[in-house]
Design a protein with these regions (language model features):
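C-terminal helical subdomain
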Residues: 169, 173-174, 193-234
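Residue(s) in the substrate-gating loop at a strand-loop-helix junction
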Residues: 133
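The beta1-alpha1 cofactor-binding region of Rossmann-like NAD(H)/NADP(H)-dependent oxidoreductases
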Residues: 53-63, 95
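Active-site helix of classical SDR
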Residues: 113, 149
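Substrate-binding pocket helix/loop in short-chain dehydrogenase/reductase
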Residues: 89-90, 97-102
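Conserved glycine-rich cofactor-binding loop
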Residues: 8, 15-16
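Conserved glycine-rich Rossmann-like NAD(P)H-binding loop of the short-chain dehydrogenase/reductase
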Residues: 29-44
């Protein structure tokens, strides 16, 4: 296990849920933070650089990455967490929700990496962690477009690993199953649905992200998949 003390991380989708849990976890291990969210919330984390940021706008991410690097002297970690979802039969999905999932989940991840990568390449040891999903590993009913967006994230991050591993940048897909967040209660889901029972917490996911980031630099984790005990394993 390596220390993260003094490292610098940029976290997208940082205002709540998994993003906020990851931010607090990293801060507790001495990581300096740049926090991207639509609200611009600094989560009460002392010294954090935070600004209103829409991941669909590359300029927002570039400005925050620049401000973070200027404040702390660089960026060592990107946690690409921002995401949206909608659930239901494909033909019932409103076009604006379809476009939002592609724009936020896919383009937003690409834009975040483009903004952070110049700084990551200057780090002595950098990490890109993509918060994907079990939905990025297998098709799930009534989640066709969400699955498509998550498969795109997984494929992008795996391809990046081939490009960047020899340059000192590790690339990891973190693929949780059900997590009890406001996001889980997304469009088309209701509290009585059985798949919402026994979900993991945001803090559970943050622990996995921390595990990934603290592995010795002589190896890397390409993908980690985990889910609640109550959730089917699907083979």
């Amino acid at each position: 296990m390596i220390s993260l003390e003094g490292k610098v991380a940029l976290v997208t989708g940082a205002s709540r849920g998994i993003g906020a849990a990851v931010a607090h976890s990293l801060a507790s291990h001495g990581v300096h933070l740049g926090l991207a969210s639509r609200s611009g919330d600094d989560l009460g984390i002392e010294g954090a650089v935070a600004a209103p940021c829409d991941v669909r706008r590359p300029g927002d991410l570039e400005s925050l990455a620049s401000a973070t690097a200027e404040r702390f002297g660089g960026i060592d970690i990107l946690v690409a967490n921002a995401g949206v979802g909608a659930y239901g039969p494909f033909l019932d999905l409103p076009p604006d929700q379809l476009e939002e999932m592609i724009d936020v989940n896919v383009k937003g991840t690409l834009y975040a990496v483009r903004a952070a990568l110049p700084y990551l390449l200057e780090s002595d040891g950098a990490d890109i962690v993509t918060l994907a999903s079990e939905a990025g590993r297998r098709g799930l009913p009534y989640e066709a477009v969400y699955c498509a967006s998550k498969f795109a994230q997984v494929g992008f991050t795996r391809a990046l690993d081939h490009e960047l591993s020899e340059k000192g940048v590790r690339c990891t897909n973190v693929c949780p199953g059900g997590v009890a967040t406001d996001f889980a209660m997304g469009r088309g889901r209701t509290p009585e649905m059985p798949e919402l029972e026994g979900m993991m917490t945001s803090e559970d996911v943050a622990e996995v992200v921390l595990f990934v980031l603290t592995r010795p630099r002589n190896h890397r984790i390409l993908e980690t998949a985990f889910r609640p005990v109550a959730e089917p394993s699907w083979g």
